[in-house]
Curated annotation (Swiss-Prot):
Coiled coil: none
Active-site residue numbers: 43
EC annotation from Swiss-Prot or TrEMBL: 5.4.99.25
Lineage: Archaea, Methanobacteriati, Thermoplasmatota, Thermoplasmata, Thermoplasmatales
Protein name in the entry: Probable tRNA pseudouridine synthase B
The species this protein was found in: Thermoplasma acidophilum (strain ATCC 25905 / DSM 1728 / JCM 9062 / NBRC 15155 / AMRC-C165)
Length: 365
């Protein structure tokens, strides 16, 4: 199995101790490739879902990182507190909240607004509380626990934390780093079925997103950088509104790209998707030609055509060539560019009797 051709995700169960970047390094060493990155950094003492992007999937790290995260954690209150009080303060911290990142964080310490979608009490024993939280990406759970303790008047802190999902990647897909290394070793010996079963393709990242299936006729234009227009759509799977992210896939269910919807699914017109990621490979040089009318006069990689000896531009009205316009046939003066830009000098050979202005600066350049 050629590991350099892997383009997808593997969900690892990060243990306590190593940093997320250390896990990146180990996966690179195991596979022998460089294109590896994790989605959503975990602190060294936090365990759970650490999704690794491999190959082309590395380009989707920022997209998947936008997805909500889920955690199970343990919080300790400094004073006695009842279950009813815990539920009350958990409800207070559900919805949009203000957060100040901790002192030891990778981002600037400025007040931010984050969304907590749900915060549930699972179990309570004495001053210890087991909870489940689903929150917006970038929410600090340690800070959340500290803030709850402060507002309750009891004081408190996070004791333990485990991430259970990042977007569509959940812990039921997790494998340990040791298991992953063993699967790779088997794949090197030709037994790659187990490894293939645990590598999720790039479309899996958009399992919960609305999707647009494009016509084959539109694929070439997209590969060359075009956005998606209404005429290139074959099927729309799911509802979306203007400004939401959508996934664009081929008729063969391969990921073509992803971008922001420029209209709603109920009112399709003109430009539909503004791509920020395209995964199609363009045919190098194909259709990249210089034309006069409908006739191709310069194909990529071939010798220079006699009619395009100069830079591209408008048709020269004197010569009939397509190139930069040389201007009128007789011009008394010309403007020199560069450091003497703006000064007007006579053409060379004009008025050699000394009646013209003296030239400066660029005579010998």
């Amino acid at each position: 199995m050629d590991f350099s051709n892997i383009n997808g995700f593997v969900v690892l169960d990060k243990p306590q101790g190593p940093t997320s970047h250390q896990v990146d390094h180990w996966v690179r060493e195991i596979l022998g490739i460089e294109k590896v990155a994790h989605i959503g950094t975990l602190d060294p003492n936090v365990t759970g879902v650490l999704t690794m992007a491999i190959g082309k999937a590395v380009r989707l790290v920022d997209v998947v990182h936008e997805s909500p995260k889920e955690y199970v954690g343990v919080m300790r209150f400094y004073e006695d507190i009842t279950e009813e009080e815990v539920r009350y303060y958990f409800k207070k911290f559900t919805g949009r909240i203000y957060q100040l990142p901790p002192v030891r964080s990778a981002v600037a310490r400025s007040l931010r607004i984050k969304t907590v979608y749900s915060l549930d009490l699972l179990e309570k024993k004495d001053r210890l509380v087991l909870f489940h939280v689903k929150c917006e990406s970038g929410t600090y759970i340690r800070t959340l626990c500290t803030d709850i303790g402060y507002v309750s008047g009891k004081g408190g802190q996070m004791v333990d934390l485990r991430r259970t999902s990042t977007g569509p990647f959940s812990e039921d897909r997790c494998i340990t780093l040791q298991d992953f290394a063993a699967m790779v070793e088997l794949a090197r010996k030709g037994e790659d079925k187990l490894l293939r079963d645990h590598i999720l393709d790039m479309t899996y990242a958009f399992k919960d997103y609305p999707k647009i299936v494009v016509k084959r006729s539109a694929m070439r234009n997209i590969a060359h950088g075009s956005d998606l227009y209404a005429g290139g759509i074959k099927i729309i799977d799911g509802k979306f509104r203007k400004g939401e992210r959508v996934a664009v896939i081929s008729e063969d269910n391969d990921l073509v790209g992803t971008g922001i919807a420029m209209c709603s699914s109920d009112n399709i017109f003109m430009k539909v998707v503004d791509f920020d990621h395209i995964f199609l490979e363009a045919d190098d040089g194909k259709d990249n030609v210089v034309r006069i009318g409908k006739e191709a006069v310069q194909k990529s990689g071939s010798g220079l055509h006699k009619d395009i000896q100069r830079s591209e531009g408008r048709k020269d009205t004197r010569t009939g060539w397509y190139g930069r316009d040389t201007g009128p046939e007789k011009t008394a003066d010309r403007v020199w560019k560069g450091k003497n830009k703006g000064r007007v000098y006579p053409r060379s050979g004009a008025d050699k009797g000394g009646g013209g202005k003296e030239r400066h600066g660029r005579d010998h350049q």
